[in-house]
């Protein structure tokens, strides 16, 4: 009766991918701004922050400005696109790999 397939348990990585795929707007947190041809990226709203940036369509915004904008509406004041509501924090090593 019904479906005889058993449900397999998802690993932590598969669960994270499933939850990331199910959300609408997902952004990756940039701890350090990546240099470009024209210099470093800064927050397009306050122009001061160059760490902990979130990419919004074609520009970067800092966490402080993102929180302020999300308090007002779900759309960006600069580009008019929907603001990211989920942030994926990449795991970065805190020390260099051990030498053999």
UniProtKB/Swiss-Prot annotation:
<keyword id="KW-1035">Host cytoplasm</keyword>
<keyword id="KW-1032">Host cell membrane</keyword>
<feature type="zinc finger region" description="RING-type; atypical">
    <location>
        <begin position="43"/>
        <end position="79"/>
    </location>
</feature>
<keyword id="KW-0863">Zinc-finger</keyword>
<keyword id="KW-0479">Metal-binding</keyword>
<dbReference type="InterPro" id="IPR024183">
    <property type="entry name" value="RING_finger_Z_arenaviridae"/>
</dbReference>
<keyword id="KW-0946">Virion</keyword>
<dbReference type="GO" id="GO:0044423">
    <property type="term" value="C:virion component"/>
</dbReference>
<keyword id="KW-1187">Viral budding via the host ESCRT complexes</keyword>
<keyword id="KW-1188">Viral release from host cell</keyword>
<dbReference type="GO" id="GO:0016020">
    <property type="term" value="C:membrane"/>
</dbReference>
<comment type="function">
    <text>Plays a crucial role in virion assembly and budding. Expressed late in the virus life cycle, it acts as an inhibitor of viral transcription and RNA synthesis by interacting with the viral polymerase L. Presumably recruits the NP encapsidated genome to cellular membranes at budding sites via direct interaction with NP. Plays critical roles in the final steps of viral release by interacting with host TSG101, a member of the vacuolar protein-sorting pathway and using other cellular host proteins involved in vesicle formation pathway.</text>
</comment>
<keyword id="KW-1198">Viral budding</keyword>
<keyword id="KW-0862">Zinc</keyword>
<dbReference type="Pfam" id="PF03854">
    <property type="entry name" value="zf-P11"/>
</dbReference>
<keyword id="KW-0945">Host-virus interaction</keyword>
<dbReference type="GO" id="GO:0020002">
    <property type="term" value="C:host cell plasma membrane"/>
</dbReference>
<dbReference type="GO" id="GO:0044220">
    <property type="term" value="C:host cell perinuclear region of cytoplasm"/>
</dbReference>
<dbReference type="GO" id="GO:0046761">
    <property type="term" value="P:viral budding from plasma membrane"/>
</dbReference>
<comment type="subunit">
    <text>Interacts with protein NP; this interaction probably directs the encapsidated genome to budding sites. Interacts (via RING domain) with polymerase L; this interaction inhibits viral transcription and replication, Z partially blocks the product exit tunnel for the releasing nascent RNA product. Interacts with the glycoprotein complex; this interaction plays a role in virion budding. Interacts with host eIF4E; this interaction results in eIF4E reduced affinity for its substrate, the 5'-m7 G cap structure.</text>
</comment>
<dbReference type="GO" id="GO:0003723">
    <property type="term" value="F:RNA binding"/>
</dbReference>
<keyword id="KW-0472">Membrane</keyword>
<protein>
    <recommendedName>
        <fullName>RING finger protein Z</fullName>
    </recommendedName>
</protein>
<dbReference type="InterPro" id="IPR003224">
    <property type="entry name" value="Z_RING_Znf"/>
</dbReference>
<keyword id="KW-0449">Lipoprotein</keyword>
<keyword id="KW-1043">Host membrane</keyword>
<feature type="lipid moiety-binding region" description="N-myristoyl glycine; by host">
    <location>
        <position position="2"/>
    </location>
</feature>
<dbReference type="InterPro" id="IPR038485">
    <property type="entry name" value="Z_RING-type_Znf_sf"/>
</dbReference>
<feature type="short sequence motif" description="PTAP/PSAP motif">
    <location>
        <begin position="93"/>
        <end position="96"/>
    </location>
</feature>
<dbReference type="GO" id="GO:0008270">
    <property type="term" value="F:zinc ion binding"/>
</dbReference>
<comment type="similarity">
    <text>Belongs to the arenaviridae Z protein family.</text>
</comment>
<keyword id="KW-0519">Myristate</keyword>
<dbReference type="GO" id="GO:0039702">
    <property type="term" value="P:viral budding via host ESCRT complex"/>
</dbReference>
């Amino acid at each position: 009766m019904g479906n005889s397939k058993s449900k397999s348990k998802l690993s932590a990585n598969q669960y994270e991918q499933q939850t990331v795929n199910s959300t609408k707007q997902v952004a990756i947190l940039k701890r350090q701004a990546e240099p470009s041809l024209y210099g470093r990226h800064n927050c397009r709203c306050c122009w001061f922050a160059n760490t902990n940036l979130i990419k919004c369509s074609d520009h970067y915004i800092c966490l402080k400005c993102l929180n302020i904008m999300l308090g007002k509406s779900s759309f960006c004041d600069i580009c008019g696109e929907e603001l990211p509501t989920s942030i994926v924090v990449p795991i970065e090593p805190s020390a260099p790999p051990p030498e053999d």
